[in-house]
Structure formats: C-alpha cells, structure tokens
Amino acid sequence: IRCSQEDRVWTLWDKEHRTHYGYSLDTGEKLWGPSEPEAQLGIFETWSIFYDGKLYTHGTKGIIDCYNAKTGEKLWSYKASDPFNEILWSDNWNIRIDFIAAGKIYMRHSEHSPVNPLPRGAPYICLNATTGEEVWRIDGAFRGTDWGGRGYIGDSILVKCNTYDMYIYAITKGPSALTVAAPDIGVPAGSSVTLKGSVTDISPGTKEYAVQARFPNGVPAVSDNSQGE
C-alpha cells in the first residue's frame, strides 16, 4: 500500500495478479483498477513511489512503470535491459528507485540475495520523470544494496555507496582543463589550419592512483550532450 497526500489517493498492489488498484484517501471509494498485469517477475518484489501526480513501480521485473495516480492510466515504461545476460533469471537488471529529485528519477541495481561473483556492469540510471526518457546511464559505475542506504542528493552532488568495492562516491559537475596544440610553423594566409587538443576532467577524484593508472594521459571529460541540468 502507498499513499499520496497531494493526490488524495492510496494504491494497493495485488501480487498474485501483478496489478494495481487506486482508492480515494478521503472516502475509500475505488477510483481505478485493476491495471494491466505487469511483467511476470514483479510477483517476487515490487515497490512503488508517488511523485508529481504519478505512481512509479519498480523491482525485480527490471522495468519502471509509470501511471497517472488519479486515473490509473499507464503513461510509460522503461526497461533496464541487461544485454550481456549477467542476471541469471532475466533479460533485465533488478532495478530500484533511489530517489526522485528535480524531475528526474535516479535508479540503482540491487538484489535481495546476490550471487557471487557479483554480476558485472550494474547500471546506475537517470530518467526524465515525466516522459521516461533516459537522461543518462552509467554501466558498471555503482551497484547498490537492498540492505544498506540508498543514494542521496544535495547541492547537485549525488552520493552513493558502491557495493562492488564498498567505497562511497560523490559525483557532480566538476572542473575541466582544455589543451590546444597549433602548428608551430608559419602558415600561408588563407590556408586551413588544424587545431588539436583535449578536454580532461580535473576533479579531485581523478588524482587517485587507481584512476591515474587507468588514465595516464588524463580522464576524458564528459561531453555536453551527455550532461543535463
């Protein structure tokens, strides 16, 4: 059961049929439901959260389903695909919502009783909460846990424990450095010139030995197209 004070709605999850129902928080009257059955693996673990007039469901099914909280209309779905079949029982990663902030959904992979060695390449995903469009996805950066804390965000800094190495990471926009190399010989007027250079990330974390060993020439900066406000 989940309740939304803002929408004056509470919802009920029918595990056996994998469907949702919506009821008035004021009168108890049934408003909508049942929804269309969700993916089969949802029978094991399905959670839900309200945000901005919408109900989001997530869990073992590896799919985020979004509904209108007041009418039950299904608005969109997002599949956290696992193209290399690291998960033994699904084509999707188990996916959990860490938090929703500023119109974006931040999601982790975690699992109740993980198999060791842990599946490789677990994604951390950011979605547009209105459209379900993928804002960014980082495969292998962070793996969450069902038993520890979720990720958190404040001052545009996302803090997350990574259960691959048990380090706590903080990610945000950081400083960068630009290098440009021009021809060191004279060029006739009107001739074309090729400038070469690089843009590197110079955030504090890039100075750690493990990072420097992997990127001896500097960590490439994230492109503008791969970032969002």
Question: What are these model-derived regions, one by one?
Answer:
Residues 1-229:
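Secretory-pathway ectodomains
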